[in-house]
Regions:
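Domain-level signal for soluble alpha/beta catalytic cores
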Residues: 1-513, 519-852
């Protein structure tokens, strides 16, 4: 019998981290396998093993809408109020041949139910409906909470986990056979949901995310990042749902298939919605066309299929015929070490030699400024160090906040959260405290590295359970109870022991970085050769990747960058994959870029040419005094700072990098000799415009956009606080609302925040807003621009009603619409003046409307 991990007391007080709690209870944590699951029968087992197909059901919301569900009704309450309607729809899917019937619990979390019913009661009623319909397998459906997690929103990871855990326990009690987590856009949120399933049940977990037209989720996660992370944290089947039609999702699913061995599932929409001549929302892809498009995905290796918005029992019947005549196509990921943030993958293939620079600067050892920042809780400075290293060429950031006088568990959690909101790079969590390590990796959105274990049995006993439970990578140091050995063979022996111990937890060599530990040449000159030899042995015999803290070699010697860069080149020749170094060192980075050409990692030398096209040889200093001055420093300037593009505007740098900690003081300083409107129009607005361009180019994603907007908000608030009333011009009035019947307001809130920071006066009417209330506000406030949001197809009717009312009563008003179910064509059909695909587009439309 599975025993859930008890991590909170009855009053909600945290008792222990899950792995610590399990360890005290005598449990041994290892990488989860299929044998750890409670699987109903062999058919379901075959699907989870990837040797058999499985057919989920199709759309429920659009079927309910067709059955007469009123706009604004909570579908989950129909399990009590009209259970026969739910059962009838599900019975149609059973008769169409669906293996899995999804319980009507998509929005059955306490946040969305908001007291309308208990989570337990909804799950019990929903599962009863599915059983009554004759379902072979009933899936407990877990959808998004409907609130942004920190740092973008106010909901903590732990609060999200608790909401999901309540659903999981309710599902287990109601008798579900598996869980399906779907329509997720936030990698941190889906991680919380998967962990809640794993830690509160032993049932199979299917997990899918939703992707935009650009191939990324709302928060910028790619299919590869999603698949790697979901695989790592223990989803048994992973994939894509909703999003678009099956033809558009084929390429995204194919990308997932290249990075995971887990079964991949797809539940596509029947195309994108439109409004027909009678005012009804319809989907155009019919069953034969749908099945034909899905057939291509099945040929690629997708083995679990179903449908989402607009699909019907007819669509599923066509899929039943398709999969009954097909055996799953095998797929295998190419062996590699993959490290991810929520937006970026750093991939080190096992059959090649690729370099990943791990930035070392977020480590308080010997850095007084960072030490003081950590004591003061100044995480803005920590973030600035991460951003600088990203701009200087780091691929991964090491994060170490270890000072004896601070609460390391609290600070490392906050630091990783803030770094993930401001940089795109994956993180390496560096701590000797297992509690601090778990606090960071548990809440980390992606697949990180833990730094580190070593050959001491106690350390391996503490750290490997974390690596196994959270699916991370790990650094293994070649030291043990006897210290650091002198010889290559002794170092290799420790590495071999680390790899063997890791295997006991199901951790393969493709998740291990061995660090053979660099000793300074000033006191251990002969050790350099032994270090390189040890690394070569590890690479050849263990199949691991290797890391080295290369800066240590030159400690205590003059011209440190010179010696360090030569050692770095030698280490690359011996097989070094991940140098832990200062990316701000010119000589180190020169060596990295040069080696990438010689190893053919930089194909066509394009990166090298881009970096060095205008290079001045520092050794020609006798003939060129300017070169001598340039050669006197070994610092790589961060991109976007003075010296690279000539723009030394501190406001611009702080807004673009999302650094809000210092912007208030800088704004106050500039106000001493700048007019307030000059500061806004010539400093803040251009910076926000630049962020918008970076967002459009795919160089920034929503977390970075939000961090920049928050930094700008702090600056604007400072200006408003210090300036007399009326001195700051109002750029225009805008009203935003989520339409009647729709309780989702994440997108609308993001738009409001950005428009606020562009200087507009924004009236936020909230969610589930009646058309008459919107009209009343527009008339009373003399508003020229209205933004309407809808996430569900069932509420687009209310959006159209609101648009028609506004245009009839206030002819001059302009209306922007946005939301996951909308397209430019759909927006035009329902009468909107503008369609905004994202918040940045809303800001540009506002500038057009108000003539700014």
């Amino acid at each position: 019998m599975f025993t859930p991990l008890i991590t909170h007391d009855s009053d909600g007080t945290a008792l222990a981290a899950p792995v610590d709690a399990a360890r005290r209870n005598g449990a041994t944590y290892k990488t989860r396998t299929i044998d750890d699951l409670r699987i109903k029968d062999d058919r379901l087992r075959a699907a989870i093993e990837g040797t058999g197909h499985l057919l989920f059901d199709g759309g429920m919301g659009t079927m309910l809408q067709a059955a007469g569900m009123k706009a604004g009704a909570l579908p989950e309450l129909l399990n009590f109020e009209e259970p026969q309607v739910i059962t009838d729809i599900q019975r149609q899917y059973v008769e169409a041949g669906c293996d899995v019937i999804t319980a009507n619990t998509f929005g059955a979390n306490a946040h969305k139910l908001d007291g309308a019913a208990t989570v337990a009661d909804v799950f019990a009623a929903a599962v009863a409906c599915a059983r009554e319909a004759g379902a072979r397998y009933v899936a407990g459906d877990i959808g998004p909470i409907g609130a942004l997690l920190r740092p973008l929103g106010t909901l903590s990871f732990d609060e999200a986990y608790d909401l999901f855990a309540e659903e999981v326990r309710a599902g287990v009690d109601a008798g579900v056979d598996l869980f399906i987590i779907e329509t997720m856009t936030d990698l941190a949120e889906i991680k919380a949901a998967v962990l809640a399933c794993r830690e509160n049940s032993d049932l199979p977990v299917f997990a899918t995310m939703t992707f935009e037209e650009d191939g990324r989720t709302f928060l910028g996660t790619s299919p590869e990042v999603a698949a790697i992370t979901l695989d790592a944290i223990g989803a048994d089947v992973l994939g894509i749902n909703c999003s678009q039609g099956p033809a558009e999702l084929r390429g995204l699913a194919a990308r997932m298939l290249t990075v995971t061995d887990k079964p991949v599932m797809v539940q596509a929409n029947a195309g994108l919605p439109r409004v027909d001549d009678d005012g009804n929302t319809v989907f155009d892809i019919q069953a034969p066309e749908y099945a034909e498009a899905v057939a291509g995905m099945i040929e690629d290796g997708v083995s679990v299929v179903g449908g989402c918005c607009g699909t019907t029992p007819a669509h599923m019947a066509a899929l039943r015929t398709l999969i009954d005549n097909h055996t799953p196509s095998p797929h295998h990921r190419k062996p590699s070490m993959s490290v991810t943030s929520a937006q970026t993958v750093v991939d080190l293939p096992c059959d090649g030699h690729k370099i990943a620079v791990i930035g070392e600067r977020i480590n308080p050892t010997g850095k007084k400024r960072l030490q003081q920042a950590l004591r003061d809780g100044d995480l803005d400075y920590v973030v600035s160090q991460g951003i600088s290293q990203q701009e200087q060429g780091a691929d991964i950031l090491d994060v170490n906040v270890g000072l004896p006088e601070i609460d390391e568990v609290k600070i490392i959690q906050q630091a990783t959260e803030q770094l993930q909101g401001s940089t795109l790079l994956p993180l390496q969590i560096d701590s000797t405290d297992p509690a601090a390590v778990e606090a960071a990796v548990r809440r980390y959105a992606g697949k990180p590295i833990i730094n580190s274990v070593n050959g001491k049995q106690q350390i391996m006993d503490e750290i490997f359970p974390l690596v196994a439970h959270y699916g991370t990578n790990v650094v293994g140091l070649t030291l043990d109870e006897g210290g650091i050995p002198d010889t290559a063979e002794a170092r290799f022996a420790i590495a071999e022991r680390i790899v063997a111990e890791a295997a006991r937890y199901g951790i393969g060599p493709d998740r291990i970085l061995i660090d053979c530990l660099v000793m300074t040449a000033s006191t251990n000159q002969r050790q350099a050769e032994q270090i390189l030899r040890a690394m070569s042995l590890c690479k050849e015999r263990l199949g691991v990747k290797c890391a080295l803290g290369v800066s240590n070699i030159s400690f205590g010697l003059p011209a440190r960058p010179l010696l360090g860069s030569v050692f770095l080149a030698a280490a690359f020749g011996a097989g070094l994959d991940a140098p832990i170094m200062n990316p701000g060192s010119k000589r180190f980075m020169d060596t990295v870029y040069s080696y990438r050409v010689l190893s053919v990692e930089d194909e066509g030398s394009t990166g090298y040419i881009e970096r060095y096209a205008g290079w001045t040889d520092p050794y020609k200093i006798a003939a060129n005094p300017a070169a001598a001055q340039a050669a006197s420093t070994d610092t790589v300037p961060a991109a976007g700072t003075a010296g690279t593009d000539g723009n030394d505007d501190p406001i611009r740098r702080m807004v673009v990098s999302g650094r809000k900690g210092e912007i208030a003081a800088e704004t106050e300083r500039l106000l001493a000799d700048h007019d307030a409107m000059d500061l806004i129009n010539n400093h803040f607005i251009p910076a926000l415009d630049e962020v918008g361009v970076l967002f459009d180019q795919g160089k920034f994603f929503l977390p970075q956009l939000m961090a920049s907007a928050e930094a700008a908000r702090v600056g604007f608030d400072t200006i408003k606080r210090l300036m007399p009333d009326g001195e700051i011009a109002d750029k225009g009035k805008i009203c935003v609302a989520t339409v009647k019947g729709d309780i989702h307001d994440i997108g609308k809130n993001i738009v409001k925040m950005l428009l606020d920071n562009y200087g507009y006066t924004v009236f936020d009417l909230g969610r589930d807003v009646d058309p008459q209330e919107v009209l009343k506000t527009v008339k009373e406030r003399d508003i020229k621009l209205v933004g309407l949001s809808a996430l569900m197809t069932t509420t687009v009717v209310a959006m159209e009603e609101t648009i028609k009312l506004l245009h009839a009563e206030v002819p001059g008003v302009k209306i922007i619409v946005g939301g996951a179910v909308l397209t430019p064509e759909y927006a035009k059909q329902i009468g909107a003046d503008y369609y905004a695909k994202d918040a940045a587009e809303s800001a540009r439309i506002a500038e057009e409307v108000f003539g700014q």
